Structures are given as structure tokens and as C-alpha cells.
């Protein structure tokens, strides 16, 4: 059942001649490191390609260690965005991107046993952790914890003024 579910959420892209295969959220034709790393927890048991997404995020990592949230080759905002391009996005409020990159690398290594692969990736992983632990937007020096801004996006906000019960509910069963 898990295998069938995840198989429907695989996206294959070719960027600069490199084949990239990864898990995606069903609502977007893009590969988010967040979704991919979470889905790898189940997919690592049967997915044949666990490294190409990690390699691509490593390849596109900024010199300071920042990692993109997602990439896509499909237009997202029609009709203004056109095809035949590759888009990389970092959502500034997200504070979990770098650790999810490290988590994805760990899960890929755990499943494949690619010791040389993970060894070669270590400088990128260290750089990602250094970035998140030293950036004033994401690191609370006093508490020694990652912090994130409170925003109305990414599931933080559900204000209905009591008018829409369906907008804010909890499943108890």
C-alpha cells in the first residue's frame, strides 16, 4: 500500500543532462526537499534512486550553505510563466530546509550503503548545518535552537472568525 502510494508521487526530471528522480507532493509538479525527505522514510525500502535529488540540491547549494526549498521545470503560474525553464525557490521563512537536506542524505546513505558518496557529500552537509546555525533569521543564539517566523503561510494560521467550521478542524478518530 505504501509502495503504491509513493509510486504515484514520483517525479522524473532532466536538468542539464542529469536525470533526477524524487518524491513530490501530489499537489505540485516540483521536488521539495521537505516532502522528498519525509517520503524517503518509506520509499528507502524500494525506490531505486535515492541519491539524484540529494545530489541536485547539493549541486545548487549556495556558497554560504543555503539550500533551495524546491525546484521544478514546470510552469506554476500560468499564463505568465512559460515552459522550457528551470526554477529554484527558497522561501525565506522556512527554517527546516538545511536539516531536511542532511536528513535526505542520511536516509539515502542508510539505504544504499554508499560510504564514498556520503563522504564526498560531507562538506556540503556541514556547510548547510553551519548556515542554519549561524544565520540570524534561523538561529536563536541564546537558546541554541532553530527558530522560524510566525506567518500566515505554511499551516500557521487558521482564522475564521467562527464562520467556517470546516476550515479549522481536528480528526479525533
Residue ranges and their predicted role:
Residues 36-49, 100-117, 173:
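Well-ordered alpha-helical scaffold segments within catalytic/enzyme domains
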Residues 1-5, 48-60, 114-135:
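Extended, well-ordered alpha-helical scaffold segments
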Residues 25, 70-100, 133-173:
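The feature captures the catalytic groove of carbohydrate-active enzymes
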Residues 1-31, 51-52, 56, 66:
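Low-complexity, Ser/Thr/Pro/Gly-enriched N-terminal "stalk/linker" regions
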Residues 50, 63-64, 73, 77, ...:
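Alpha-solenoid repeat scaffolds
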Residues 61, 71, 75, 105-113, ...:
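Generic hydrophobic/packing signal
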Residues 30-33, 95:
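Alpha-solenoid helical-repeat scaffolds
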